[in-house]
Amino acid sequence: MSYRDLRECIDLERGTEDVGLAAGRSQREKKRSYKDLLREEEEIAEQVRKSSKKRSKELDLFSGNELHKKKKKHSSDDYHADHSTDSAKKKKKTSLPSPSSSDTAMDLLKAITSPQADTSTTHPSKKPEKILATPISFSSPSQPPHKDYHKKSGEVSGDDSSHRSKKSKPLTLREPDGLRMKLIMSPNEKSEEEAVSPQGGPGHSDSASSKKNSKKLGREEIESRSSHKKHKKQSYTPRSGGTPDSASSTGGELDAGELVIDDSLRDMKKKKKSKKSKKKKDKHKDEKHKKHSKSKREHEVEQSQTQIASPGLPSPPPPPATTPPTSPPSIPLQPQALVTHTEEQSDKKKKKEDPEKPKKKNMSAYQVFSKEYRVSIIAEHPGIDFGELSKKLAEVWKQLPEKDKLVWKQKAQYLQHKQNKAEATTVKRKSSSSESAPKSKGSSSGLVSPNKKSPTSSVASFSTSPAKVPDTEPIDVAAHLQLLGESLSLIGHRLQETEGMVAVSGSLSVLLDSILCALGPLVCLTSHVPQLNACPKQILSNTLDNIAYVMPGL
């Protein structure tokens, strides 16, 4: 082979390689353009989502003009979308699966954009309209941020005119709180819409509807916010025989229509009524319970009174038939009312007296000593201060021998015992007097005759007060003897504990003191025997008081 032949072969091979490279480059460029288109569509979709979220938060009355401008641009882009065949074919491939569906979609698009579409559209053409809405939304890169807004305007322009001409049924909006609203169209608005739809072309009708929608959307949302702040989601019922009404289509009819409320918040009123009825029932139950408890108490008091009266006295005989039946029951009711009233008063007095009672204080030997010795110090030093007096008393108490301190201790114990005994006797007297009072009342109620002669006798029995009891009663004597026994037992325990011999003089003095402490109370018992009552009561009471100084072992 010559050099030329080799050069030609190499050139041919290079040419084929260049052709292959060019074909590969064209395919890559096609793929890149396809990918770029997909990316652009995704970016537009993201922009639509973001703007829809922002719009739902920041929509106000001033946003109507901006929406109107965007809608104008959008309608002009849709009107010229048929001329750009290359871009439409590529996007139909991405959105529509088969060529037959793309042909039908193009036919329907032409039918919608033509001025005769308002009368020719029927119910079977609903599904392809929904399919068409997706490719049209991606046709222009300068699309406004609402996909759904374009769908709603397209559907309303086709369907609303035919349905309003056929049927004038009111639109119904179903709110979540049970508030059902009817939108009745006024005749002026119907005539205006019928006049606008055939005269203006598709661009004019779209712009008019977009103006109404943009202005009245703001009003609708302000009303919905003021009426339902708590509920964010709103569910609307579809129209009979047509496509479901969107927020934009219904918002355009709120201004001209009359609003009729069917169910005005019945659920809220029912809840409030149920709460009020529950409160009333609870109050009624409490009042019944209180009345029932009061009646029970009164019944128990009456039963106790009848039981007290029945054992003491025989039951009165039944009244004869000739006597009138009204007079006997009125007589025994009076003492029962008196008893209940007195019992209530006594309960109140007890409640008042309980906090007023001072606590009992035990008398100490130093207190008894200071009480008696204070008089002598004041007599010696008139006008002495309380602080100096207390200091002198403390010094004298310290200088006292133990025997004298024991004597003062015994005296304090005796006085304490006497005080306790006096309180016990007063309590017994009160209880006995309180027991005797209902008995006398019961007897008086049992003995009451129709002539009413017994009240004077019952008053006389109440007026007699018990005589003042002297200090030399058998109870006092028994208390002194009990103290003597306790002191002697203490001395015996101490003698058992001590080791060694005990002085005879000490034992004799203890025995003599114990004899005196035993004989003194026994002499007081002679006052209760008339044959032996020779000593005056004052001397006997003084001896009982002085026994405390002689009591051994305390």
UniProtKB/Swiss-Prot annotation:
Keyword Acetylation appears in the UniProt entry: no
Keyword Nucleus applies: yes
DNA-binding region range list: 359-427
Function per UniProt: Negatively regulates Wnt/beta-catenin signaling during development.
A cellular component annotation (GO) from this entry: nucleus
Compositional bias ranges of the Basic residues kind: 268-296
Top-rank lineage group of the source organism: Eukaryota
Coiled-coil positions: none
Organism, scientific name: Xenopus laevis
Biased composition (Low complexity): 95-105, 433-445, 454-467
Family matches, as Gene3D superfamilies: High mobility group box domain
Name of the protein described by the UniProt record: HMG box-containing protein 4
Biased composition (Polar residues): 113-123, 236-251
Oligomeric form and interacting partners: Interacts with nlk.2.
SUPFAM superfamilies, sorted: HMG-box
Principal subcellular localization: nucleus
GO biological process: negative regulation of Wnt signaling pathway; Wnt signaling pathway
Keyword tags: Developmental protein, DNA-binding, Nucleus, Wnt signaling pathway
Compositionally biased spans, kind Pro residues: 313-332
Disordered as annotated region, ranges: 15-368, 417-469
Chain's gene name: hmgxb4
GO molecular function: DNA binding; protein kinase binding
